[in-house]
Design a protein with these regions (language model features):
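Active-site ExK catalytic segment of metal-dependent nucleases
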Residues: 205-214
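Arginine/glycine-rich "motif VI" loop of SF2 helicases in the C-terminal RecA-like domain
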Residues: 225-232
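Short, hydrophobic beta-strand segments that form beta-sheet elements in well-ordered domains
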Residues: 234-240
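Domain-level recognition of nuclease-like catalytic cores that cleave nucleotide substrates
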Residues: 241-254
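Accessory nucleic acid-recognition modules appended to NTPase machines
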Residues: 16, 21, 25-200
Length: 254
């Protein structure tokens, strides 16, 4: 019922603030003190930044820069990594920073999402490493970096705050935690879909969209994707804030 839904929603909102790091959770449960929780997030964030001791100084600096760019990149429209911003040099590509990206993803500090323009099962056969998104490994770290101690950014319905990046990060973390390799759809003519995952049961690809606004049934890129007969994909999932579960034209809204 609505009462139970509101309770679960409030707890989910606090999860967005606290995240899943054991120390952050324990500090929150001890006295509900968000100042202590945010300090824990800062400590973990700083530890991640300096925890590249196996590399020489040049690699360390690039790893830190890439990691520091993650929140601001996610706030951009395309959300993908802009390689020229890492060192302020034009003409740079993914291959110039492959070692740094590998460190961040293999260590679990960041989640890599590779582009797919022509989806086929299994997705790994058609991924493009040149267009990569990175998400932080914990949503609490992200909201700490974005909003600091202002919990109202998440707890209140503030029109000036777009929580799309936060919700996408949660979905990325959950998909990764359940063993899915992360991809997204990027096509100049058809648009972009937030996530693509392999559906091993149906030997097909499952597209996933994450919506934070009231217009969650409007998704032109997803429609274009599903209407492309060459792909042979006729089902998708859209996550939203609405307390409604229904299916329409192959799209399941949750």
């Amino acid at each position: 019922d609505e009462s139970a839904h509101n309770i679960l929603l409030k707890r989910f909102q606090y999860y967005l603030l606290v995240g899943g790091m054991p120390e952050a959770i324990n500090n929150y449960l001890a006295d509900r003190n968000m100042t202590r929780v945010r300090q824990t997030h800062k400590d973990i964030h700083n530890l991640y930044r300096i925890d590249a001791s196996q590399y020489d100084e040049d690699h360390k600096l690039k790893i830190r820069k890439i990691y520091d760019l993650v929140p601001s990149n996610l706030e951009n429209k395309k959300k993908r990594m802009v390689y020229k911003n890492i060192e302020g040099k034009k003409g740079k590509t993914f291959s110039d920073y492959a070692d740094e990206f590998e460190y961040l993803t293999n260590s679990g500090v960041a989640l890599e999402v590779s582009a797919i323009s022509n989806p086929r099962f299994p997705l790994v056969e058609s991924e493009q490493k040149r267009l990569v998104k990175l998400y932080l490994n914990d949503v609490g770290l992200l909201t700490s970096l974005l909003y600091g101690l202002n919990v109202n950014a998440v707890l209140q319905d503030i029109k000036s705050v777009n929580l799309g990046t936060v919700y996408e990060s949660v979905v990325a973390q959950e998909l990764a935690a359940h063993g899915f390799k992360l991809h997204y759809y990027d096509n100049k003519k058809k648009g972009e879909v937030d996530f693509l995952v392999d559906d091993h049961g149906k030997l097909n690809v499952l597209p996933i969209e994450v919506k934070s606004g009231k217009d969650y049934t409007q998704h032109s890129a997803l429609n274009n994707f599903l209407e492309t007969s060459d792909y042979g994909i006729n089902r998708a999932i859209v996550f939203s804030n609405e307390r409604k579960v229904f299916e329409k034209r192959g799209v399941t809204y949750l």
